[in-house]
Amino acid sequence: MSWPSLSGVPNGSSSVSTWLSVTHPRRSLPKELLTAFDTCNVAPEALLVLRSTSLMILEETCVVVGAAEMPTAEDNSGRELFIGSNGDPMERKTRTAHHAIKKTVRIKKGHRTTFAMTVANGAYVKFGARPLTEANVLVVRKWIVKLIADEYKDLRVCDQALVIDRATFLSFIPTMAWNNYKFIFHGKNAVTDRVAGENLFSRIAQWANPGKXGCPVVVTGQGCVISRAPDCAQLRVKRLLGVTKNRTCMRVSGVSPNIQIIPFNNDITTLERAIKERVFFVKNLDKGSPTKFVSPPRPAPGVFAQRLSNTLGLLVPFLPSTAPMSHQQFVDSTPSRKRKVYQQALEDISCHGLNLETDSKVKVFVKYEKTDHTSKADPVPRVISPRDPKYNLALGRYLRPMEERIFKALGKLFGHRTVMKGMDTDVTARVIQEKWNMFNKPVAIGLDASRFDQHVSLEALEFEHSVYLKCVRRMVDKRKLGNILRHQLLNKCYGNTPDGAVSYTIEGTRMSGDMNTSLGNCVLMCMMIHAYGLHKSVNIQLANNGDDCVVFLEQSDLATFSEGLFEWFLEMGFNMAIEEPSYELEHIEFCQCRPVFDGVKYTMCRNPRTAIAKDSVYLKHVDQFVTYSSWLNAVGTGGLALAGGLPIFDAFYTCYKRNSNSHWFSGRKGRLKTLSSVDDSLPWFMRELGLKGKRSSAEPLPASRASFYLAWGVTPCEQLELEKYYKSFKLDTSTLLEEHLWQPRGVFPDED
């Protein structure tokens, strides 16, 4: 889809009344002959009166005529004719037996402008009074087009074209009530009184709260309530009298929405709940049952081999034939932040050898992450479960040579690139747009696999491992790899906290720290969805990033694809739910991002509310303000590389860079140094994609503002106000504020 441009509208118009020329007196207003251009030259006073009386006129005159079949006739030669709106017979060019006579709805002559005013009233209620800018016109016109398509789809095309153009511009004319209140609240006396009151309030607020806006605030981690899940025989919990150390992080005050981001502490109560509710139990979907928690569903024996055999047969010709890397090659290919760990593991293997029985044991702990406590009142903490680095080294040297090639094989299975790992925001959006354009009337649906790792059963792991073994060239290497993978089928786990310890053994399930977690999730999801598409005989495309999936298909196939999906995946051992269908490209949500048009091309854009809230949190305690400035510069640099030129984000990340006071961070080398210096504290997308991003700071274009509104519901006017706020905002990098002295305040327009 390409966004049209608006010509003839001067930039910087404060309101429509300053742009529309008053050329027609009210008494000579030719409503019957108005065109879209003429409507823009109507006196605002006349249109205000027309707006207030349009509903009454519509009701009295019945502007919209009821649908009726077109009258037909035949001429002397036997050709079928239909009677046009002007009463003249016209030939129907194509006519077959299965073509029905089309019904149409028209607007009575002389009332097109009145009907346009009714539509304009709806747009005015939706968007309110706003300046006439190109971005606002694009947003309003898009909304009116959708309204006409949904509510008046049988309206004649010529009437639709006239109504859309007229209603778009009529909706920008403010009502008399708006003008009256604008004078009351923005008159000279009103402004003087309000400024005096605001100054007094500002002085009182500064006296009561000495903390400066924009300074770092210490946020203390918290535990969670005791799990309501039942006790489990496999889980052994030992409580001690130790004192848990609170995790602390830092939040930039005054820049984000009012969303509570608080990490969980690694105490025994929190760890026990995480294990119970993310490993052993799931919530019972039967609301009427007295049992609130049940064991995760498990597939029937042989169901994977039976249902995925055809898909596996189609995939095998595309699978690579690989040989393992050497241990040193694997260490050298590891990201720098983990290279030291694996170099030490290699030295341990060289000295003491590899003991799979002990090295495959899993150490669990509560994940230190930015947890949203606003969208979920009682979120369940997540658990991290890595094995010994020596085990990961032994397995990784087999999997790394085949990983990217398996991703390409899965793309060939669907006929188009499918796995989106490692792609930057521009490439991801381009691939999604290509998939969208493959269908005549496309629809996209997200598939939500609830707690995917927990539902990866023993049968699923065995099937996944069989795919890896088909990629290994030599038989001796197949046996070695099979022996290493076998230790993932029965997991022995333990965890220690200052106030307790846990241990348990579980069959199957995905361990989040395994080398094949990402690859395995992609393999299982892609193959199951492909098999389900074959089962339903529906042509589909898939965008996948592990357990994040979006399926593209024709709208006519949506009902067929959706029916029975939950039951089919439940028999495979997964709780799979279908999210709301997306009929607009901007509504497709993939990995918490949506495609947004930047004026030239589409790019993936994160949710501004949650993204800015999380990007204002630094998962370390600030003991040196040089570190704080480095982090600000790193987030600003990575953010602009991914979202430069997009509404709100460009101003937000520029604000970080401007206030970082790190002038020595410049150029490619400085960028590398900045990101690596605080690498562990950056979001994953900035670590993985920040250096790949090619975007830079730029003023958002009108088409980008309109597309951003479609994606995230922030109007162009709200975008401009937020950007104005960030452009003038000054961060305080010299004062550390305690948490009890700071109250979170939202900066988005729809927040208190």
From Swiss-Prot:
Residues 442-561 form the RdRp catalytic domain. It catalyses: RNA(n) + a ribonucleoside 5'-triphosphate = RNA(n+1) + diphosphate. SUPFAM superfamilies: DNA/RNA polymerases (SSF56672). CDD domains: Tombusviridae_RdRp. Gene3D superfamilies: 3.30.70.270. This is RNA-directed RNA polymerase. Keywords: Nucleotide-binding, Nucleotidyltransferase, RNA suppression of termination, RNA-directed RNA polymerase, Transferase, Viral RNA replication. Signal peptide: none annotated. Readthrough of the terminator UAG occurs at position 213. InterPro entries: DNA/RNA_pol_sf, Rev_trsase/Diguanyl_cyclase, RNA-dir_pol_PSvirus, RNA_pol_HCV. One of its GO terms (biological process) is viral RNA genome replication. Its EC number is 2.7.7.48. RNA-dependent RNA polymerase that plays an essential role in the virus replication. Belongs to the tombusviridae RNA polymerase family.
